[in-house]
C-alpha cells in the first residue's frame, strides 16, 4: 500500500481481518476503500451492503457512493499496533476466533460455531475497563468493543449502533460459562426492536 496515493481507490479482497488491516493503513489518507467479500464471514462488507460482484463495486466507485466509518486501534504490550473495523474481542470471543482458524477453509462460517461449542467453559476473569477516563471493575468470560454490530442472519449485537460517531459500544459477557450467554443471544435473534429486558 505504499503507492496507494497514486490510485483513486483501493479494493481489499478478503475477509474481515484483511479488510480491517487495509482500512487501518489507509485511515486518514482520504483514499476510498472498497471491501470485496472474499473471506469466511465478510461481515464488514455485509454491514456496508458492499456488492460481491466486481462490476457493481466499480459502479459504486464511479458514482462516488462513499461513507466514512470509525477504525479502532489496538496496542499490545510489546508496542505492536493494528486496527479493527468490526469488532475487537478479548477472552471468549478471541478464543473462538483462534479455535476457528484451522477449519475456516473447510467449514466456512460454521467454523466459528464449532469453535464456540468446543469451548463451552471459557475462562472466567476479573475485567478492568478504562472508558473515557473512568475505570470500571467487572467480571465475565470476555469483553467486546463493537463498531459495526450486525452479524450473520441479520443479528445485531447491540440495538442502537452508530459506526460513525467516534465511539465504540462495549459489551461484557458477564457470565460464568457459555450457557449463560444463551438468553442474550436469543434476545438478539428475536427482539430486533431492542425491547427485551436482556437485550444489550
Model-derived features: where do they sit?
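Short glycine-/acidic-enriched loop or helix-start segments at secondary-structure transitions
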Residues: 21-24, 44-46, 154-155, 182
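N-terminal glycine-rich "phosphate-gripper" loop used for MgATP/nucleotide binding
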Residues: 12-16
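Conserved Motif II region of HX4D acyltransferases
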Residues: 17-18, 143
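Short acidic/glycine-rich loop or secondary-structure boundary segments that cap or lie
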Residues: 93-96, 137-139, 151-154, 178-182
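Catalytic core of DAGKc-family lipid kinases
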Residues: 27-145
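ATP/nucleoside-binding phosphotransfer catalytic cores, i.e., glycine-rich phosphate-binding loops
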Residues: 131, 137, 162, 172-200
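Gly/Ser/Thr-rich active-site loops/lids in small-molecule metabolic enzymes
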Residues: 104-111, 145, 151-180
Amino acid at each position: 500500500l505504499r503507492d496507494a496515493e497514486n490510485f483513486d481507490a483501493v479494493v481489499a479482497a478478503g475477509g474481515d481481518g484483511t479488510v480491517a488491516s487495509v482500512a487501518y493503513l489507509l485511515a486518514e489518507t482520504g483514499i476510498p476503500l472498497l471491501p470485496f467479500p472474499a473471506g469466511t464471514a465478510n461481515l464488514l462488507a455485509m454491514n456496508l451492503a458492499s456488492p460481491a460482484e466486481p462490476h457493481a463495486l466499480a459502479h459504486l466507485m464511479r458514482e462516488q457512493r462513499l461513507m466514512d466509518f470509525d477504525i479502532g486501534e489496538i496496542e499490545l504490550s510489546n508496542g505492536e499496533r493494528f486496527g479493527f473495523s468490526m469488532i475487537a474481542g478479548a477472552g471468549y470471543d478471541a478464543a473462538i476466533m483462534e479455535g476457528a482458524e484451522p477449519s475456516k477453509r473447510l467449514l466456512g462460517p460454521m467454523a466459528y460455531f464449532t469453535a464456540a461449542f468446543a469451548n463451552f467453559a471459557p475462562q472466567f476473569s476479573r475485567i478492568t475497563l478504562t472508558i473515557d477516563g473512568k475505570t470500571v471493575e467487572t467480571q465475565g468470560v470476555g469483553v467486546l468493543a463493537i463498531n459495526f454490530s450486525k452479524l450473520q442472519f441479520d443479528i445485531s449485537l447491540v440495538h442502537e449502533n452508530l459506526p460513525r460517531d467516534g465511539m465504540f459500544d462495549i459489551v461484557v459477557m458477564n457470565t460464568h460459562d457459555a450457557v449463560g450467554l444463551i438468553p442474550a443471544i436469543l434476545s438478539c435473534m428475536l427482539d430486533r426492536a431492542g425491547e427485551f429486558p436482556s437485550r444489550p
